[in-house]
């Protein structure tokens, strides 16, 4: 058991043969943590990353939908406004600074997310609106469901397992832990501390 920046990880080999990595993400109290993003980084993974053909984060009911979007580096994201009021979407995050001034409908050009990192979004008109685009430099990423579980399929090798949640303090980087995958099925439990409910 090893604790590193609030990340606790247990790794167990289950059987021989190629199989996926199953992650169980928990909060500090050991409860399943829905909506956590987990991803595996390595030099080899970086060479495999490809932008998505299509991605969008809409605005509906004066909220970003979905509130968290995970995309590989280089992905162009549309921001359709499905409300009857105008929105002014912006980000001042170092990974991507941009502004889509007052609009209804879909802007003519999508926003290309060309650097990895956490991009916090807001609406200059509706201050309560907040969303996140997590830009990853790997094809091996997933978001946990209500049960706190996610499955990653990656070839054997040495990786950095990174975990992020929107409940982490603003500006907090993804937590990370070294991890070696074999050709056996593996299960890991990730415990994230510092996540607000």
State the predicted function of each range:
Residues 2-10:
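Sec-dependent signal peptide recognition
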Residues 13-16:
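N-terminal signal peptide c-region/cleavage motif recognized by signal peptidases
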Residues 18-197:
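Extracytoplasmic copper-binding redox domains, predominantly the cupredoxin/blue-copper superfamily
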């Amino acid at each position: 058991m090893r604790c590193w920046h609030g990340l606790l990880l247990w790794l167990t080999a289950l059987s021989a043969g190629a199989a996926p990595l199953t992650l169980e993400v928990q909060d500090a109290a050991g409860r399943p943590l829905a909506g956590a993003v987990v991803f595996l980084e390595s030099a080899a993974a970086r060479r495999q990353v490809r932008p998505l053909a299509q991605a969008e984060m809409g605005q509906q009911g004066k909220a970003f939908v979905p509130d968290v979007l995970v995309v590989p580096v280089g992905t162009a994201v549309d921001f359709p406004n499905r409300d009857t009021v105008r929105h002014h979407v912006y980000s001042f995050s170092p990974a991507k600074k941009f502004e889509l001034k007052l609009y209804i409908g879909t802007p003519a050009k999508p926003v290309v997310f060309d650097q990895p990192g956490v991009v916090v979004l807001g609406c200059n008109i509706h201050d309560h609106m907040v969303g996140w685009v997590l830009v990853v430099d790997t094809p091996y990423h997933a978001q946990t469901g209500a049960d706190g579980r996610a499955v990653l399929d990656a070839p054997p090798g040495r990786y950095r397992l990174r975990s992020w949640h929107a409940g982490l303090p603003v500006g907090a980087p993804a937590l990370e832990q070294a991890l070696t995958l074999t050709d056996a099925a593996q299960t890991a439990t990730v415990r994230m501390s510092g996540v607000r409910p």
